[in-house]
Amino acid sequence: GASKRGWTTWSIAAVDKRIVAIVPIVIDMLNVVPSFKHHYRAYGFYAPAVGDYVEMGIMGWQDTPEYKRLLEIVEPYEYLERYTMPKYLINASGDQFFLPDSWKFYYKNLLGQKHLRYVPNAGHSLDGSDAVYSLAAYYNAILNKTKLPEYDWDVQEDGSIKVTTKVRPKEVLL
């Protein structure tokens, strides 16, 4: 599911054992409070895309006990131990709601097989992008039980990305 339906993707995966894999799309906000605090610090304001939430005062609730209690129920990050199924997160590099480094608030804490893609030159709608092809490829791999690449990556102090693989790749395309 995409956007709000991406949130639903996380939510249903936390409670339904029939789910074999998930692909939340353009919902790059697990661990929502640090993510949105980072959003504000990066821009110095909340992006117009989240204006309705700002107008309703929701951003001002983030440090309240009531908001914390609400997140204990509805925040997918609260259920990390349940997301043991394969996960493919598809996000947009130019998302109007979420920053392209929001992964740093949750990705390393996800359990099991996980893959993350930021679709280049795409906004929240992913219009005009090739995202559907990577979704279809992942779907096909899950259905056919195709072994997917196993790797880990870390952003280094100098900004470079170090990738470690289980099997030496024959080729790497950037």
PLM segments and residue spans:
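Hydrolase active-site cap/lid region
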Residues: S11-G60, R117-P120, S125-D130
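Short beta-strand/loop motif that positions the catalytic acidic residue
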Residues: Y83, L89-N91
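Core-facing hydrophobic residues within beta-strands of well-ordered domains
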Residues: I19-V20, Q113-K114, P169
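Acidic catalytic loop of the alpha/beta-hydrolase fold
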Residues: G94-F98, H124-S125
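Active-site nucleophile elbow and catalytic-triad environment of alpha/beta-hydrolase enzymes
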Residues: M29, Q62-Y79
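Short alpha-helix in the alpha/beta-hydrolase fold that links the catalytic acid
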Residues: L99-Y107
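Glycine-rich nucleophile elbow surrounding the catalytic serine of serine-hydrolase chemistry
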Residues: G1-A13
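Surface beta-strand/loop "capping" patches
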Residues: D130, A136-L173
